[in-house]
Amino acid sequence: MKINSIKIGPYIKDTLFFFKRLNIKKPIWLGTSMGGIIGMVLASKYKNIFKALILNDIGAFIDAAPLIKIGGYAKKTVLLDDLASAKEHLKLIYAQIGIKDEEDWDYLTKYSVISTFGGKYKMNYDPAITKGMKNASNQEDVKLWSVWNKIKCRILVIHGMKSQILTKSTVKKMKETKTFDLYEIKYAGHAPSLMNPEEINYVKSWLEKKS
């Protein structure tokens, strides 16, 4: 399965296998960025798979320009001298996620980097993930309107209002086609960390009201 330039078929298969193996039925799915796209595709194909869907700064349309930027960064391996350097690197590349406390940056650093054989640190993700993305010159806008229109479960959209991935115009158009709850985070871009107490409390409150 391919959504424009993003290949998500393996993620869909893995998720369905995971649900079946652990006998998970009608969970609430909270997906950030690509995780949100996977959730939307699942909800559109399997009408009763989720009790509710929470989309963290992702929607029915993504402009190509920020995807080119993300793809270019993800393909690079940056080596960092120590954890302090790693923390400063994360503060630079994740400046828009809205983290306020140093303790949260420490936590993010702990789980975002791994040590290398040379004693340095690098980002803890599989660089092969970029193989599913097109070259910058061929990158297209990602259009998920047909997927979005088929979703039937309850939806909360979390919008980092400084985001280039989920723009105000996209949110407006999404509202024209479907009813959903919207949580706007003014100080964040792509994508809100959901680590600040006010963010956590909002999501918890929404879940309690919808249970």
What annotation goes with each model-predicted range?
Residues 1-30, 201-205:
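Active-site loop/oxyanion-hole signature of alpha/beta-hydrolase fold enzymes
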Residues 88-153:
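Alpha/beta-hydrolase
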Residues 1-5, 64-67, 168, 195:
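Conserved catalytic-core motifs of eukaryotic protein kinase domains, centered on the activation segment
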Residues 58-85:
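A catalytic-pocket lid/entrance helix-loop region that shapes and gates access to the active site
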Residues 22-66:
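Conserved hydrolase catalytic core segment
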Residues 188-198:
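Catalytic histidine-centered segment of alpha/beta-hydrolase-like enzymes
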Residues 150-188:
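Conserved loop-alpha-helix segment in the C-terminal half of the alpha/beta-hydrolase fold
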